[in-house]
Amino acid sequence: MLTMAEKRNIFLVGPMGAGKSTIGRHLAQQLHMEFFDSDTVIEDRTGADISWVFDVEGEEGFRVREEGVIDDLTQEQGIVLATGGGSVVSKENRNRLSARGVVVYLETTIEKQLARTQRDKKRPLLQTDAPREVLEALAAERNPMYEEVSDYVVRTDDQSAKVVANQIINMLEER
């Protein structure tokens, strides 16, 4: 088990549908740490859901809010943070994540993303007739950024959230 001194912040990055929120909750529970989801914090602070923020402020307005939330949360101690899929597009966010905790990239396939997100109406970037093409374009843009910022990479395709959380804990303990 990780000691209190070893309980640095754990930041989860990766595409939508990779399991960041679900795995993050398992990690936080098992490590007795506090869990945050940056999208949920944005919704709490604005009093509106992410789709509304996108509709009213556009992606740019959303990203400004996201930068503020990530700046605030990464200054906490002993937390698990599930970031939004596009958070790594901001160089500021990448710098803060790298400097203030251990970054784990949760990797998944486009097929798994489609399966996990197809009924989710809370994903503004997928409200399109061509979600596969959107996910492929996002992967081409963002995957190199996830790799750049991450200390560890874990594939989430065919494993339960609990198994992935245990893998991450084992990796951190070996550190």
UniProtKB/Swiss-Prot annotation:
Main location, first listed in the record: cytoplasm
Positions contributing to ATP binding: 17-22, 123, 159
Keywords, sorted A to Z: Amino-acid biosynthesis, Aromatic amino acid biosynthesis, ATP-binding, Cytoplasm, Kinase, Magnesium, Metal-binding, Nucleotide-binding, Transferase
E.C. designation(s): 2.7.1.71
Pfam families in the record: SKI
Gene Ontology cellular component annotations, sorted alphabetically: cytosol
Protein name listed in UniProt: Shikimate kinase
